[in-house]
Amino acid sequence: GAYTATKAAVVALTESWAGELHSKGIRVSVLCPAFVQTRIFDSERNRPSQYQSDNVNSARKGSFSSKTKQMVDNGIEVSIVGKRVVEALNDGEMYIFTHPNYRPVLQQRAEAIDQALQKAAKSPLLQHVVNQKLDML
């Protein structure tokens, strides 16, 4: 949904800024947390009344929401996330992960993208761009 889309957008912005700011000596990092013990499920209290909806509230009461809430409640502590951020910044990491156990999921995504690129490289429609060098790399 919208929450996941905004997280993906932040990663894309970070990657773009990293490329744009590298020549100026500015490093950019993005925090990619999984389940952290936060009060995210209490955030509805901050939504202005004109934007509140019974549909949103009822969707949050579903089984997906209760399972996700349990995972957040059992997530890592915010203080550990903060220490991990400092550690990663000191090491110059661009992507700051809190849950390395998500690696197989990310590898699967990267492999799917790689396979799609390999197929595109074989397309007769794209042969004129296959060997073009990209200035951004």
Where are these regions (language model features)?
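Active-site helix of classical SDR
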Residues: 6
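Charged, glycine-enriched surface loops/patches
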Residues: 63-64, 108, 120
